[in-house]
Curated annotation (Swiss-Prot):
This is Large ribosomal subunit protein bL27. PANTHER family: LARGE RIBOSOMAL SUBUNIT PROTEIN BL27M (PTHR15893:SF0), RIBOSOMAL PROTEIN L27 (PTHR15893). GO terms for molecular function: structural constituent of ribosome. GO terms for cellular component: cytosolic large ribosomal subunit. The gene is rpmA.
Length: 93
């Protein structure tokens, strides 16, 4: 005699998966291209950590966002062998 017992009181319902979710992108990266003209306070680069360092006339926010301190032209430059910086140079009028 073969008995086929199924105890359904402890089975999980088959409806959703445990890993079926993803977080939205954080919109990080370059916000002002090299050579573009920006005003003071403009966001130049959004980042987590100091992927790019602040150069001349560039400030760094609490979340490591780089922003222009003066009106001028954006310039991305090398800082040594393996680092980069972004600077803003005022335009002579």
């Amino acid at each position: 005699m073969i008995m086929d017992l199924q105890f359904f009181s402890h089975h999980k319902g088959g409806g959703s998966t445990a890993n079926g979710r993803n977080s939205a992108g954080r919109r990080l990266g370059t916000k002002a291209a090299d050579g573009s003209v920006v005003t003071a306070g403009s966001i130049l680069y959004r980042q987590r950590g100091t992927h790019i360092n602040p150069g001349e006339n560039v400030g760094r926010g609490n979340d490591d966002t780089l922003f222009a301190l003066v009106d001028g032209v954006v310039k991305f430059e090398r800082l040594g062998r393996d680092k980069r910086k972004v600077s803003v140079y005022p335009v002579a009028e």
